[in-house]
């Protein structure tokens, strides 16, 4: 694990799941975007994770209340989605600002499956091949329910 990643974990008070740590160490996600999921806006991804998960200079934050939910971090954003990683079990959630619950749309069982599914859709589009159907993607990523299937339908159809 890189020093910046370790410092980000310490700052955020979490331990990144192994699948997340492996890919973050392997790839520079600082300026990476695929299928309308943007991981960073340039620069160091570990710094971006800290920025996304701390109160900003204007008091803005993605969570309600004083304290960020334990073990949850935003790791990417897209229009209109905010992507949450549960550092306790590795699950990935797609959250909309209007959702009453943070973790009611589990779109993948872990970061590697989520990343591979997004990359597969992106590569299929770039190579003008058939995009995998949402049901196949949902099965591969071990998505939670019909809400997750709705997310993958939208993602595969963009």
Whereabouts are the PLM-identified features?
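Short acidic/polar mixed-charge low-complexity motifs
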Residues: 79-81, 91, 101
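Generic alpha-helical propensity signal that fires on short helical segments
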Residues: 30-34, 38, 91-93, 110, ...
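Compact, glycine/acidic-enriched structural inserts
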Residues: 94-128
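Generic alpha-helical structural element
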Residues: 9-12, 100-103, 107, 141
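Short acidic-glycine loop/turn motifs at beta-strand connectors
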Residues: 86-89
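Glycine-rich, aromatic-bearing surface loops/beta-hairpins
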Residues: 114, 135-146
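A surface-exposed partner-binding patch
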Residues: 1-84, 131, 145-158
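Generic structural signal for residues positioned in beta-strands
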Residues: 73-74, 91, 113
């Amino acid at each position: 694990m890189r020093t910046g990643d370790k410092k980000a974990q310490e700052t955020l008070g979490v331990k990144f799941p192994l699948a997340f740590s492996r890919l973050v160490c392997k790839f520079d996600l600082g300026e990476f975007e695929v299928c309308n999921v943007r991981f960073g806006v340039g620069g160091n991804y570990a710094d971006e994770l800290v920025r996304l998960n701390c109160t900003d200079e204007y008091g803005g934050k993605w969570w309600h209340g004083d304290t960020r939910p334990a073990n949850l971090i935003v790791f990417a954003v897209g229009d209109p989605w905010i992507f949450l990683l549960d550092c306790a079990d590795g699950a990935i959630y797609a959250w909309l600002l209007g959702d009453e619950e943070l973790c009611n749309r589990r779109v993948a069982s872990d970061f590697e499956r989520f990343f591979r599914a997004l990359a597969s859709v992106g590569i299929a589009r770039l190579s003008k091949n058939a995009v995998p159907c949402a049901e196949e993607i949902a099965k591969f990523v071990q998505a939670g329910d019909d809400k997750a299937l709705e997310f993958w339908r939208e993602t595969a159809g963009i």
